[in-house]
């Protein structure tokens, strides 16, 4: 099992994954990122027309790189710190001697 999948599994089991997602959603809403991305989607759809030839997948492919660059550094740093704290907890739990009683 890779470190990434172990962390992923741990965060799912402990409920930390949903806490991280909730934190991310709230921070992106607070900073106006969600509104910016929503507006970007509307503008792209208006440019491409409404003839239904532009798919959701195409919209996602076009918006995703731009949207990622708009995520504020403060939000990225906060999430990285949260993930580091989780990794530290995992490491500390792994280092604790097992109770042999």
UniProtKB/Swiss-Prot annotation:
Biological processes per GO annotation: heterochromatin boundary formation; mRNA export from nucleus; poly(A)+ mRNA export from nucleus; positive regulation of transcription by RNA polymerase II; protein transport; transcription elongation by RNA polymerase II
Keyword Nucleus found: yes
Cellular compartment(s): Nucleus, Nucleoplasm; Cytoplasm
Example of a GO cellular component annotation carried by this entry: nucleoplasm
Record HAMAP family: ENY2_Sus1
Function: Involved in mRNA export coupled transcription activation by association with both the AMEX and the SAGA complexes. The SAGA complex is a multiprotein complex that activates transcription by remodeling chromatin and mediating histone acetylation and deubiquitination. Within the SAGA complex, participates in a subcomplex that specifically deubiquitinates histone H2B. The SAGA complex is recruited to specific gene promoters by activators, where it is required for transcription. Required for nuclear receptor-mediated transactivation.
Subunit structure: Component of the nuclear pore complex (NPC)-associated AMEX complex (anchoring and mRNA export complex), composed of at least e(y)2 and xmas-2. Component of the SAGA transcription coactivator-HAT complexes, at least composed of Ada2b, e(y)2, Pcaf/Gcn5, Taf10 and Nipped-A/Trrap. Within the SAGA complex, e(y)2, Sgf11, and not/nonstop form an additional subcomplex of SAGA called the DUB module (deubiquitination module). Component of the THO complex, composed of at least e(y)2, HPR1, THO2, THOC5, THOC6 and THOC7. Interacts with e(y)1. Interacts with su(Hw) (via zinc fingers).
Protein name: Enhancer of yellow 2 transcription factor
Species for this entry: Drosophila simulans
């Amino acid at each position: 099992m890779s470190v990434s999948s172990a962390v992923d599994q741990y965060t799912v089991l402990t409920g930390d994954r949903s806490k991280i997602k909730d934190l991310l959603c709230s921070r992106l809403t607070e900073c106006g990122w969600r509104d910016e991305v929503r507006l970007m989607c509307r503008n792209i759809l208006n440019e491409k027309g409404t003839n239904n030839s532009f798919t959701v997948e195409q919209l996602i492919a076009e918006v995703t790189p731009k949207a990622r660059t708009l995520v504020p550094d403060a939000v990225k740093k906060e999430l990285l710190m949260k993930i580091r704290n989780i990794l530290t907890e995992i490491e500390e739990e792994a280092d604790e001697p097992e109770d042999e009683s």
